Amino acid sequence: MHVAELIWNSWENGQKIISLPKKLIPSSRKEAYKIQENLEKFSNDIIVGWKIAATSKEGQKHIGVGGPLAGRILHNKLYKPEDTLIFGHNKMAVAEPEFAFKIGKTLKPTKTLYNLEDVMKLVESLHLSIELPDSRFKNFATVGEFNLILDNACAHQFAISQGIDYPWQSLDLSKHKVKIYNSANLQHDGIGANVLGDPRIALTWLVNELSQNDITIYKGMIVSTGTCSMPLPIKSGDKITADFGDLGSISINTK
């Protein structure tokens, strides 16, 4: 069985993977992303965007890695504000507030690195996002970055708003405060600087990470850039709200 099929089956049936045979573990990030690509086939779904895991020190500690990782957002795992998400087999059981950007032009791999200014010129719109991550590994904090790339960088469910009708381009997103809370009045506060220093820096990292690994990012794709706060513990039945101040808020329900 293809390792991506193992990951997808675990994603769907909730049976966590203890470990993979050594022969199935990739030896490089490029190999890991190449295997990750097969999730589209085994899920019988389409890729509508990308997520970045471990863009904060808290996020890196949470999954046991030293730097960010990229994962694919599947169409059937993408929701709208106020939707009800099935909690199901989610063992990670956290929610994360994130800035997301829609890409306005297809970016093919290049030998040179993109800079932040060039990347931001290609952004079509800013969006608000709540991610409910999960892992297919039982002990996700110890399996290492190559396995976590196979695991789609712990991607699971996302709720993403429409484009923000606000002149956000003039804002310093690194200083923009965010809070996320649930219906049990548990709240975590965050800030854009928690996302690799600035969500725009995180987006630039993602574009270059894909380019260096021979991956095209297509026009219209959404990139959710990573959590601005510590992951908020949640449970089935919660209403979860991420408040981005002047940019608005986004809420979802779970059951």
Segments from the language model and where they lie:
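A short beta-strand-loop-beta hairpin characteristic of the jelly-roll/cupin
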Residues: 112, 208-213
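Short, charged beta-turn/beta-strand-edge "cap" motif at the junction between a beta-strand
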Residues: 228-232, 246-249
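Buried hydrophobic packing segments
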Residues: 39, 160, 203-210
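Catalytic-core "active-site belt" of small-molecule-metabolizing enzymes
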Residues: 2-197, 239, 247-255
